[in-house]
Design a protein with these regions (language model features):
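DNA major-groove recognition helix of helix-turn-helix/homeodomain DNA-binding modules
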Residues: 55-70
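Short, charged recognition helix plus adjacent turn
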Residues: 1-8, 70-80
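Recognition helix of helix-turn-helix/homeodomain-like DNA-binding domains
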Residues: 36-51
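A short, Lys/Arg-rich alpha-helix, primarily the initiator
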Residues: 1-23
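Short basic helix-loop element that most often maps to the first helix and adjoining turn
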Residues: 15-34, 59
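Conserved hydrophobic/aromatic packing and binding residues within compact polymer-binding modules
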Residues: 17, 31-32, 42-45, 71
């Protein structure tokens, strides 16, 4: 695995989390406010201008009530 592969995985994780946020009708503003993040951070992460840390991924996934394992499984299925 190289740096580009890691970035692709990060992009896919963000895509899953963004899809869940939208599906649940949660705005970027509400997500930012409720998680203590800035709206610009959420915007940059979702637009691929910033890669989230593991802490940020866990924080957002817990807020959205999305299991990390299910995210990894969906990415693993995409990867094959």
């Amino acid at each position: 695995m190289n740096k580009r592969d890691a970035q692709n995985i990060s992009d896919k994780i963000v895509a899953v989390l963004k899809e869940e946020r939208i599906k649940k009708g949660i705005s970027q503003y509400k997500l930012a406010k409720d998680t203590g993040m800035s709206k610009s951070s959420i915007l940059y992460i979702e637009n691929g201008k910033q890669h989230p840390t593991l802490y940020t991924i866990i924080l957002i996934s817990k807020y959205l009530n999305v299991e990390i394992g299910s995210i990894i499984s969906s990415i693993d299925n995409m990867w094959q």
